A protein has these predicted regions:
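Internal maturation/activation junctions in enzymes
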Residues: 337-360, 364, 368, 386-463, ...
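Conserved, charged catalytic cores of large soluble enzymes
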Residues: 2-57, 142-156, 168-281, 310, ...
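Short Cys/His-rich micro-motifs in 6-15 aa windows
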Residues: 792-798
Length: 798
């Protein structure tokens, strides 16, 4: 049968794929993916016995070439000699104290912050459970004060992430989790309704079975913590029950509605069903899991790690689209690739640099890995199967079962060769109810006899940039394709704008093989063209074969009824899923943007500057009266509507033009910002008379503060519609207003006007983290990965 990789080998490389490969993965001297594979294979083989290294280097290389790749950190850092971790993500414990350790041995808040900063500096993303931190208003006996609560400390962790630059220039993502019974859960749920707050975090609520049962019974729910409340909270009704304090009770349905409203309108929080996670855990007798990595596919104990590597499913489709023969999936080749991948990821644990000794100790004790797959949506289309129909789900389940069985069998073989993981105990590992207890009896017998090399083996992660770079933009992870093609504009470092046609792998392969893309077959079904129930049904089909979790986003249309939306989460819990994230385009947050900073034009030659009256240096303010324009500037901050009056003075030029030479703010205006806005105007006046006004305004547009985005003006999208524009600070917003004011008089340099910001052809943007590429607060979780709905940028966890 004709292999898909033989066909795709003749496909021209997409420019976007080549650029991602070069920018994120290739190292100096590497010319292409094969050079990179050589580097990674040699690194993985280096931890084998010396007499086996050449053999395994060749096998690892062949497996990489066949489509079994590592996660982003492995492909980027393996074999480089950098002290950067090969692990994508970790879970960082956080205790209920400031320094040292709390009563249960968890690191204090600022010790946890230090450890997380070191982890991110080395290239890892971090997940946290903040539930141990005492609530706002709880008593702090050591200082006779009241606690500020976990949300205030999440602000600190968020700002730290903004400051820390990760190894390899990738800023680590973060996941914040809070239990549904924490007294501050309402504040946590609604925190990200403020645009830009916690922009470096995904957030999820840990929901227990007890809460879901209270919800079904329409009962009350207690918000509890073991920390004693302050006097005011006790006066309001907080009472002690056993070893904990009940801070308040409220209807479970009211609390759930707050969660659902935020998810429906603001795309967060996600939901983690932590009781399901812990009951299914092979190591449930040894550990408690309360958090996940930032993308949710790895529920992890304190200091646990994500050692992940997907296998590209379209590479194992034979006769795609039944062209030249009946389409089929090569299960034997896939199983063989999975077996080699288990060894490769097990070697990563020994090869990796570990940011913290606790992380290394945890990894060595349990040797968690996560073999997964990517490109499921594309593979099903190539097999002429619809993602949203029973036949497609049956094929996906068969693929997942093959993955599970091949991975566990390979881990048994590794245990025979290298030894079982130190914490292995057959009785507890195979106890009724664990994931391993559902394996085939013959495989369980082998585990009892020989043990397992790895406590966990399967994880369906998002693939983000590795899918772009190594899989020809195949659909991510378990997801269907989000769209078959779109255009993406990217602002380069020199200020120029590059435009890409981004195409889905299956779509472009179908065209390459002679298919009519104007009349796509019915099995080409995208994420937004199928019902939400189909997304959940696919998770239900695959989850039984995954010993950790699945990172997946359930896409629903903007008009999806709220009642049905809430029902998705109830259905997910009833189905035994371990979590759920949703994506719904909507009008409330669909316009929360932050325009790319205006770019300064390249400096002209000195002689040209001197000859240009708009840029010639003026030693001092011209004497006498100048034409002036006063402008009222209205903008919105987290404190509400704000107003400033600014005056701009213009110098008439001989050619009839006017040059802005003076900016000031009349005295007597209220507000603590007046002094630094006034100072900025004085500096801008000096810049204007020095001939570099445009550059100064562009620099001001980049100024950021820590009080959240500022709304002023509008952004014009590619289709001509206007949406509100957001800025990183008050100064940045005022600079934007000045650019508009000068542009209205026709005196701003060409290309330096606020309209110079690039418009992006993309789906309607949603509120989220700030995109590092276009600047919009539109980074959401799509396909379980960070994705900018404004410009198409794919971020972390890929």
């Amino acid at each position: 049968m004709k292999r898909d990789d033989e066909v795709t080998g003749r496909l021209p490389v997409q420019p976007i794929s080549q650029d991602v490969l070069v920018q994120k993965y290739l190292k100096p001297g590497e010319q292409g993916a094969d050079d990179l594979f050589q580097r990674v294979a040699a690194a993985l083989a280096s931890v084998e016995k010396e007499e086996l290294r050449d053999t395994w280097r060749e096998r690892f290389l062949a497996n990489l070439q066949a489509g079994a790749i590592g996660a982003g950190r492995i492909m980027s850092a393996a074999g480089t000699g950098l002290e950067a971790t090969l692990i994508n993500c970790f879970v960082q414990p956080v205790g209920d104290c400031i320094q040292g350790q709390d009563a249960d041995g968890y690191p204090g808040i600022y010790e946890a912050l230090r450890e997380a900063a070191e982890t991110m500096r080395r290239g890892g993303g971090v997940g946290y459970d903040f539930s141990r931190i005492r609530p706002r208003g709880a008593a702090v006996r050591a200082t006779a004060s009241l606690a500020s609560g976990p949300c205030s400390y999440i602000d600190v962790f968020d700002r730290s992430c903004s400051t820390v630059e990760s190894a390899g220039a990738r800023r680590g993502a973060q996941m914040g989790v809070l239990r549904i019974d924490h007294p501050d859960v309402l504040e946590f749920i609604t925190a990200k309704r403020t645009p830009g707050r916690w922009s470096n975090f995904n957030v999820s609520v840990a929901v227990s079975d007890a809460f879901m049962q209270a919800l079904e019974a329409d009962g009350d729910w207690a918000l509890v913590h073991r920390a004693q409340p302050g006097g005011a909270l006790i006066a309001q009704g907080a009472v002690k029950e056993g070893d904990r304090w009940v801070y308040r009770r409220l209807p479970a349905r009211a609390l759930w509605d707050t969660v659902m409203r935020s998810a429906y309108d603001f795309a967060e929080p996600g939901i983690l069903f932590t009781d399901t996670i812990n009951k299914d855990n092979n190591l449930r007798e040894l550990e408690r899991i309360d958090a996940t990595n930032p993308c949710g596919e790895q529920p992890l104990p304190p200091y646990g790690c994500c050692d992940l590597g997907p296998v590209i499913l379209p590479r194992f489709v034979r006769h795609p689209f039944s062209i030249g023969g009946k389409a089929g999936f090569d299960f034997d080749a896939f199983g063989a690739a999975v077996a080699v991948q288990v060894r490769a990821l097990d070697n990563v644990l020994d090869l990796s640099f570990w940011p913290l000794p606790q992380q290394r100790a945890e990894a060595m004790a349990k040797r968690r890995i996560g073999v997964g797959f990517t490109g499921l949506g594309d593979a099903l289309a190539m097999l002429c199967l619809r993602y949203d129909e029973a036949e497609g789900r049956e094929m996906a389940a068969r693929i997942a079962r093959t993955l599970r069985d091949a991975a566990y069998a390979a881990s048994v073989a590794l245990a025979r060769e290298k030894g079982a993981f130190p914490a292995f105990d057959a009785q507890s590992h195979l106890a009724p109810g664990t994931f391993a207890s559902r394996l085939d009896p013959a495989l369980q017998a082998q585990i009892r006899e020989h043990g397992l090399r790895n406590s966990h083996l399967v994880s369906i992660a998002p693939t983000g940039t590795v899918s772009l770079a190594f899989a020809d933009n195949a659909s991510n992870g378990i997801e269907p394709a989000f769209s078959w093609t779109y255009r993406r504009k990217k602002r380069e470092a020199d200020g120029s704008v590059s435009e890409y046609q981004v195409e889905d792998h299956a779509w472009r392969l179908y065209r390459f093989l002679g298919g009519d893309i104007e009349r796509l077959p019915a099995y080409f079904v995208s994420a937004l063209s199928m019902p939400a129930s189909a997304h959940l049904a696919m998770m239900e089909a695959v989850q039984p074969y995954v010993d950790t979790a699945i990172s997946k986003t359930v896409n629903v249309p903007a008009e999806f009824p709220y009642a049905d939306f809430k029902g998705l989460y109830q259905q997910a819990w009833n189905a035994g899923l371990k979590g759920l994230a949703t994506y719904r385009p909507n009008t409330i947050v669909g316009s929360v943007l932050d325009a790319a900073p205006a770019q300064a034009q390249p400096e002209a030659q000195a002689a040209a500057v001197a000859a240009d009256p708009m840029r010639a240096q003026i030693e001092s303010r011209p004497k006498g009266a100048l034409n002036a324009l006063a402008d009222k500037i209205e903008y919105w901050t987290s404190q509400g509507r704000q107003t400033l009056y600014l005056v701009v003075s213009f110098l008439p030029l001989a050619d009839g033009r006017e040059r802005a030479v003076e900016f000031f703010m009349p005295v007597g205006q209220n507000g603590e910002s007046q002094q630094w806005v006034t100072a900025s105007m004085r500096l801008l006046s000096l810049a204007a008379r020095g001939g570099f006004l445009e550059r100064a305004l562009a620099d001001m547009r980049k100024v950021a503060w820590d009080r959240g985005p500022v709304r002023l003006g509008h952004y014009r999208k590619a289709d001509g519609t206007l949406v509100p524009q957001w800025h990183d600070s008050e100064v940045a917003a005022i600079a934007f207003a000045i650019q508009n004011l000068i542009a209205r008089r026709g005196n701003l340099e060409e290309g330096a006007s606020p309209d110079g910001a690039s418009s992006i052809e993309a789906p309607a943007p949603m509120a989220g983290a700030k995109c590092p590429e276009c600047g919009a607060h539109a980074m959401i979780r799509k396909d379980g990965c960070d994705f900018c709905t404004q410009c198409g940028h794919v971020g972390s966890c890929g």
